[in-house]
Amino acid sequence: SNGLSRVLQARSREKILIVTDARKELDAGLPVRDFLLYVMSTRTLLGVVSESGNFSLHVASQMRLTPATPGERFEETSIGSLSENLRREIENDFPLLHANALVGLWGALEACINDLCLLWLPCMERQELGDALEGTRVKLGEYLSLGEEEQWLWILDQLQRSDGGSLRTGIGQFESILKPLGVSPSVDSAVRTTLFRIKAMRNLYAHRAGRADAKFLKEWPGHPASVGQIVIPTSNQIIAGYTAMVLYVEAVHGSMQSKLGTPRSLPEPPPWINSVEDLLPMLEPNPYVPEGAPWSYHFSHDQQDRDSSEDSAASSV
């Protein structure tokens, strides 16, 4: 009995340490910090690519004026071919780069919310945690075979599986987990709408190579794309997306802090926008809907013009 008592005491001390560590990390907002760093890295990457692309195109235009070999066509050189591809990317606002950024940003958002929940679970009252788990199938043997930290991850996984949150639209994916955990942040309607549409676009590139389906067009009424056509993410849409993500993550963290007795002021918009009201106009779709995908020969604006010119020339012969 003394041995059992020592084991139970050791486990009790271990639980206290885990709760204390979780509370410290939650107070410090470490998952939020990591997410903000991801957003800033994405902003930097998109900015560097755009600026470098425009500068490289400027250099290429100067080289066009002074060819290295007299009589050589600039378009036939390696630099000329590269600059032509670069020009298409710039004119079309780097569509595939923005699409990949969108998928990555949503994945980082999911990871941030999961990490916040994992820190929140040990801080909950046991009665609240029991209520949250009501209705889930708990395999006691599987649960007890795990270490303390793994048990929290297992609990979160069970909650996510039982609710099918990943199939929900917009931030419903996260609210389906947060609400049972007693976390209900106040979310501005503009932020909610932005994340609803951004997730719909993200799903297209995660599962359909960017091609619109009926579900997307229902979630984004008025979008110029038709079923089967490519949905082009604009730079403004990406900015609106990660801005709304930042505001949402800060709201979730603030709600957790309030429940723990350390309330925080409502999150303010990041410095690159004036107010949340700026988000919805930034979601305006690109009116141009290409015939092909960003990686196809027929994607560029100028390809349609070139085909028209060739058709006109052929008809005049």
Task: Give the residues covered by each predicted segment.
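Helix-loop junctions and short alpha-helical segments
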Residues: T69-F196
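Short amphipathic alpha-helix initiation/capping segments at coil-to-helix junctions
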Residues: D188-I198, V231-T234, I238
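N-terminal low-complexity, intrinsically disordered segments
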Residues: G53-E75
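Short helix-loop boundary/capping segments at the starts of domains
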Residues: S41, L45-F55, N114, L118
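Hydrophobic/aromatic-lined pockets within catalytic cores
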Residues: E110-I113, C117, L121, E125, ...
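Histidine-centered, metal-coordinating catalytic motifs and their short helical/loop contexts
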Residues: V191-L217
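Polyanionic, low-complexity intrinsically disordered segments
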Residues: S1-L26, L30, D34, T44, ...
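Generic structural concept
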Residues: V32, L36-V39, R43, V103-W106, ...
